[in-house]
Regions:
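Class I SAM-dependent methyltransferase Rossmann-like catalytic core
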Residues: 2-4
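Serine-hydrolase catalytic machinery in alpha/beta-hydrolase-like enzymes
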Residues: 8-107
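Active-site signature of alpha/beta-hydrolase-fold catalytic machinery across serine-
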Residues: 43, 126-127
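Residue in the alpha/beta-hydrolase core beta-strand immediately N-terminal to the catalytic nucleophile
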Residues: 111-113
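Gly/Ala-rich beta-loop-alpha elbow adjacent to hydrolase catalytic centers
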Residues: 115-120, 124
């Protein structure tokens, strides 16, 4: 048996909290932990929301059912199977999210912060 890998285009999602505009002074990129989703994670960060802060929560590219097939799907950033490929794909995705969010923003007057929880922290440290 031979293993083959190919790169494919994948649709991924991320969530944001706040409004990115001329009042924005801080952008926070927040990466969820293992078996979470970006939207649920962002809910836990609502206390950081104010008119000067824009929070971006990318979601891990690998989804799965945490307990059974009737539960809501959750996500992870990597598994031990083809781990290096998962890491490479995640970094490519995070770079694209960063570029999309900051494309029309003058970052000279904006603090950009990075926050990761659990597996999100490990992913963040590689980014």
């Amino acid at each position: 048996m031979q293993k083959h890998n190919i790169e494919v285009l994948k649709t991924a999602r991320y969530f944001s909290l706040g409004t990115l505009n001329s009042q924005t002074k801080k952008i926070i990129f927040a990466l969820h932990g293992y078996a979470q989703t970006a939207d649920d994670f962002l809910e836990s960060l609502k206390s950081l929301e104010d008119k000067e802060t824009y929070i971006v929560a990318p979601e891990g590219l690998s989804r799965f059912y945490w307990k059974d097939f009737i539960s809501n799907p959750v996500a992870s950033w990597m598994t031990k199977l083809d781990r290096e490929d998962d890491i490479k794909d995640s970094l490519r995705y995070l770079n694209q999210v960063f570029k999309e969010v900051t494309n029309n923003v003058d970052l000279k007057n904006i603090d950009v912060e990075f926050f990761g929880f659990s597996q999100g922290a490990a992913t963040m440290s590689r980014w």
